[in-house]
C-alpha cells in the first residue's frame, strides 16, 4: 500500500480540511490504546522511588501522567523524521526535542506541528499548541506499594566499601509497576490531519521503552490500538470516567 492509498483508507470524519494555526473548526479523533507492561517499569513522581497512586473502591492503582508516554513517543517520531530526511527538507540538523532553537522556520517540523513547541526568536517568544491531548491513565490492576526492590551502588571492588573501607549509603528501593499490568489510555488529535494521525500512530506502535532508567532495562511495554472515535467536536475521554 502506497502513501496515497494509506491516507484514502482512513475515514474523513474527525479531521481538519487542512492544517491551520487558528483552529476555526475542532474535529477530533481519539485513539483508545491498551498499554501492557511486559517488564517492571519505574514511573517516578514527587517520590523518586514510586509512581503516583489513586485509590478506587479501597484498592490502590498506579497513576501515570500521559506526558510520560508521549515524551518517549515524540523521540520515536523524531528518529523517523531523521531517517527519511534528505538535505534538511523534513527536519533541521539543529532541531532537538525540548531544546528550542532561535529560528522559527527551523523549528517547523512534524514534531512541532503535531505536539507543539515554545521558543524565542530575536527576543520574542513563539509557541505552537499541541494538537495531541493526552490525559492521566491508571493501572487496571492493583499497585502493590510493599513490592519493593533493593538497589545499591557498588565500588570497583565489587562491594559497598571503598578503598578506605568506608560504607556506601547509596541504597534505594523502587516500587515498579509489574508485568501484566494494563493501562487504558485515550490520546486525542484535535483539528489534525490524516498525516498527523498516521505520525502519532507510528510513534505509539513504534515505542516500547518507558519510565525511568529505560535506557538500561530495554523494552518494557507493548502498545495496541483497540479503538478509534471520531467526532466533529470534542471526543476526548478520561480514564477516570471508566
Predicted feature residues:
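RNA-binding basic/glycine-rich loop and surface signature characteristic of RAMP-family CRISPR effectors
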Residues: 1-242
Amino acid at each position: 500500500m502506497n502513501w496515497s492509498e494509506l491516507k484514502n483508507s482512513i475515514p474523513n470524519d474527525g479531521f481538519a480540511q487542512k492544517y491551520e494555526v487558528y483552529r476555526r473548526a475542532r474535529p477530533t479523533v481519539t485513539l483508545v490504546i491498551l498499554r501492557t507492561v511486559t517488564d517492571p517499569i519505574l514511573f517516578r513522581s514527587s517520590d523518586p522511588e514510586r509512581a503516583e497512586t489513586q485509590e478506587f473502591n479501597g484498592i490502590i492503582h498506579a497513576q501515570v501522567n500521559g506526558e510520560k508516554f508521549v515524551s518517549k513517543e515524540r523521540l520515536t517520531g523524531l528518529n523517523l523524521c531523521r531517517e527519511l530526511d534528505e538535505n534538511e527538507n523534513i527536519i533541521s540538523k539543529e532541531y532537538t526535542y525540548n531544546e528550542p532553537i532561535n529560528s522559527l522556520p527551523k523549528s517547523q517540523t512534524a514534531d512541532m506541528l503535531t505536539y507543539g513547541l515554545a521558543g524565542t526568536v530575536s527576543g520574542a517568544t513563539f509557541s505552537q499548541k499541541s494538537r495531541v491531548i493526552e490525559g492521566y491513565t491508571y493501572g487496571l490492576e492493583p499497585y502493590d506499594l510493599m513490592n519493593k526492590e533493593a538497589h545499591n551502588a557498588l565500588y570497583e571492588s565489587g562491594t559497598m566499601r571503598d578503598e578506605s573501607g568506608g560504607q556506601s549509603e547509596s541504597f534505594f528501593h523502587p516500587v515498579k509497576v509489574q508485568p501484566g499490568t494494563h493501562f487504558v489510555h485515550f490520546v486525542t488529535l484535535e483539528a489534525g490531519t490524516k498525516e498527523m494521525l498516521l505520525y502519532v500512530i507510528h510513534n505509539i506502535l513504534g515505542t516500547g521503552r518507558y519510565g525511568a532508567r529505560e535506557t538500561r532495562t530495554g523494552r518494557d511495554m507493548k502498545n495496541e490500538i483497540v479503538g478509534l472515535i471520531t467526532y466533529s467536536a470534542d471526543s476526548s475521554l478520561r480514564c477516570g470516567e471508566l
